[in-house]
Amino acid sequence: MTENAVLQLRAERIARATRPFLARGNRVRRCQRCLLPEKLCLCSTITPAQAKSRFCLLMFDTEPMKPSNTGRLIADILPDTVAFQWSRTEPSQDLLELVQNPDYQPMVVFPASYADEQREVIFTPPAGKPPLFIMLDGTWPEARKMFRKSPYLDNLPVISVDLSRLSAYRLREAQAEGQYCTAEVAIALLDMAGDTGAAAGLGEHFTRFKTRYLAGKTQHLGSITAEQLESV
């Protein structure tokens, strides 16, 4: 199966690593594509979908390495998803060019309460050109840092998603009400943008991932050990 943008970014991160990366469950032997325990691999269930919306994942340092990351699920379902390592001072040239691409309407996905008063904030994708949803993918403190310290994104509007239901995701607990995982927000954005088929496909993929990930945690698969540690 073709590697998606997040897996490619993960491979690049591993290639420049200088020390072992010890995520939770690092002794479990995992599928190197879906990062679930091998016995719970879901790669054969992945079914890509079509959407006019496009996603750009701006990922904090080791985020692509984490089995709990859900940005990878977006790239599984929407193959034209792009992913970049975040940098405050040296952003990827490809990222800068994508943000300036006149074929899209770029916007930063983040809660409205964190935007400055002068920042344009919207709550639904605008009509017209396809939206480019820029998602800041990391822990909540990391996402806040990326939002504050990415001057090359400061001129873009912020789109804020208010999910009325409690988050279904409990792999890594949010630190405050109204904070949701990356894939969950993407599902809502796709639905609001009219990409209902892609929203349904990502929702199904997310549910399968969540179920199998939590099953792997519950089983405490300590006897299924990895042959080698990844580096960071």
Swiss-Prot record:
Extent of motif DXTW: 137-140
A Pfam family it matches: DTW
One MF term in the entry's GO annotations: tRNA-uridine aminocarboxypropyltransferase activity
Activity regulation description: The degree of the acp3U modification at U47 is dependent on the presence of the m7G modification at the preceding nucleotide G46. It also depends on medium conditions.
Xref: InterPro entries: DTW, DTWD2/TAPT
Knockout or disruption consequences: Deletion of the gene leads to the loss of the acp3U modification. Mutant has no obvious defect under normal growth conditions. It shows motility defect and genome instability under continuous heat stress.
Impact after mutating residue 31 to S: Complete loss of activity
Superkingdom per UniProt: Bacteria
Class of the enzyme per the UniProt entry, highest EC level: transferase
Catalysed reactions, semicolon-separated: a uridine in tRNA + S-adenosyl-L-methionine = a 3-[(3S)-3-amino-3-carboxypropyl]uridine in tRNA + S-methyl-5'-thioadenosine + H(+); uridine(47) in tRNA(Phe) + S-adenosyl-L-methionine = 3-[(3S)-3-amino-3-carboxypropyl]uridine(47) in tRNA(Phe) + S-methyl-5'-thioadenosine + H(+)
Residues that coordinate or bind Zn(2+): 31, 34, 41, 43
Effect annotated for changing residue 43 to S: Shows weak residual activity
Keywords associated with the record: Metal-binding, S-adenosyl-L-methionine, Transferase, tRNA processing, Zinc
EC number: 2.5.1.25
Biological processes per GO annotation: tRNA modification
Quaternary structure and interacting proteins, as annotated: Monomer in solution.
Function statement: Catalyzes the formation of 3-(3-amino-3-carboxypropyl)uridine (acp3U) at position 47 of tRNAs. Acp3U47 confers thermal stability on tRNA.
Family assignment from sequence similarity: Belongs to the TDD superfamily. DTWD2 family. TapT subfamily.
Comment on protein domains: The N-terminal domain binds zinc and is important for activity.
Protein name: tRNA-uridine aminocarboxypropyltransferase
Organism: Escherichia coli (strain K12)
